[in-house]
Amino acid sequence: MTTVQLQKTNQPSIKASRGSYWITTFGCQMNKADSERMSGILEYMGYYPAEEELKADLVLYNTCTIRDSAEQKVYSYLGRQAIRKRSLPNLKIVVAGCLAQQEGESLLRRVPEIDLLMGPQHCNRLESLLNQVDSGQQVLATEEQFILEDITTPRRDSSICGWVNIIYGCNERCTYCVVPSVRGKEQSRTPEAIKSEVEDLAKSGYKEITLLGQNIDAYGRDFQSQNKEDSAQVTLSYLLKYIHDIEGIERIRFATSHPRYFTKELIDTCSELPKVCEHFHIPFQSGSNKILKNMGRGYTIESYKNIINYIKAKIPKAAISGDAIVAFPGESETDYEQTLSLIDEIKFDHVNTAAYSPRPNTPAATWPRQLNEDIKVKRLREINSLVENIAKERNQRYKNTSQEILIENINPKDSFQLMGRTRTNRLTFFPRSLKNGVENKLGELIKVKITDVRPFSLTAKLL
């Protein structure tokens, strides 16, 4: 969960002040990017960032429904705002994102104080929806929509690294996942629109971009179904080449990939383009072919390993991360051990792990052989221990080496340190100090020497 509390823009709003706003974001990078865009819309409308959540005139929760724990947090936050609204009737409460799409009218019945409830496909319509609220309506916007190309400038949380959505929605039907039902069908943005946004970021001084999509390597395939001219050529590989030479952008990343669409052509392209960073996040979810089939993932462990082996052959220094779910319905001890074996064999730099959480309206939630909480806790603890040990082992290769770091921020826990990431996405901390009488600035690319390693971060000194 992240909170968007941004500095006030230097550019005056086009419209008169309408009060303060606060956005709290739950969940994935797509939600973070959506929140930045909604912040831009609110400031265009005349809102300004609040200093505190409980003092805001408009509160927006951009929600996640991938796990039950995320939902419960939202309900807790909404309860607090509902109490506020009873004494502050002009307070506006907005719920956006995947939980809003999933629950719809039932959420309005549960929390009638909500003024606007809208799914992810409606983020770019925030202004018109709030205008309906201002006319006295309680607004529900969850119908499937074509996502408008928004010309409003996002109010970005960083002035160095920018998110760029390139494909919305998901056409997969994983049996545990609600994303297709809440984010809709795949919809790729045109290469021209994406390039224009990246060029604007470069002009504003951004050094790194991360291209985003639920299944980013499926980019462009919906163009083919629409019979657009030259649509077969529009792929993620094509897009990377198309935007690569934009002046000012030093690094390009992308997430999240689906193994089914991760091609040798894409790997070859990444190896040829110097701005594309050597980090690949490719979720595997399980090391058992039986479980992968039950999950509806559409690939085997053997095909997944082929992808990883090809990456390692073409880009030997690449870092590889993934996602894993343990305690999926029917997962035997053997299935679970196969997941541990896969992690140990591939030696992932990092794995995001989770115990299976039944989600409403998904096939797996109704299946027999649901595993109990004790097994979930045990397996999650064990896999996390393995992931941490391997991550520290993998990080040893950086010790005493020189690495390029993009300075992103001051360490929030130590104001005497700066922080940034290597090209392989290793978070790195190093001291603030003068070089030729001048302190390094945020947004600079510098060389450091790695002096110490931890499982999920590095410590360095300036060269």
UniProtKB/Swiss-Prot annotation:
Keywords: 4Fe-4S, Cytoplasm, Iron, Iron-sulfur, Metal-binding, S-adenosyl-L-methionine, Transferase, tRNA processing. Residues 396-463 form the TRAM domain. One of its GO terms (cellular component) is cytoplasm. CDD domains: Radical_SAM (cd01335). One of its GO terms (molecular function) is metal ion binding. Its EC number is 2.8.4.3. Monomer. It is found in: Cytoplasm. The lineage of its organism: Bacteria, Bacillati, Cyanobacteriota, Cyanophyceae, Synechococcales. HAMAP family: tRNA_metthiotr_MiaB (MF_01864). Pfam families: Radical_SAM (PF04055), TRAM (PF01938), UPF0004 (PF00919). Its main location: cytoplasm. Binds 2 [4Fe-4S] clusters. One cluster is coordinated with 3 cysteines and an exchangeable S-adenosyl-L-methionine. This is tRNA-2-methylthio-N(6)-dimethylallyladenosine synthase. It catalyses: N(6)-dimethylallyladenosine(37) in tRNA + (sulfur carrier)-SH + AH2 + 2 S-adenosyl-L-methionine = 2-methylsulfanyl-N(6)-dimethylallyladenosine(37) in tRNA + (sulfur carrier)-H + 5'-deoxyadenosine + L-methionine + A + S-adenosyl-L-homocysteine + 2 H(+). [4Fe-4S] cluster 2 binds at C170, C174, C177. SMART domains: Elp3. Residues 19-135 form the MTTase N-terminal domain.
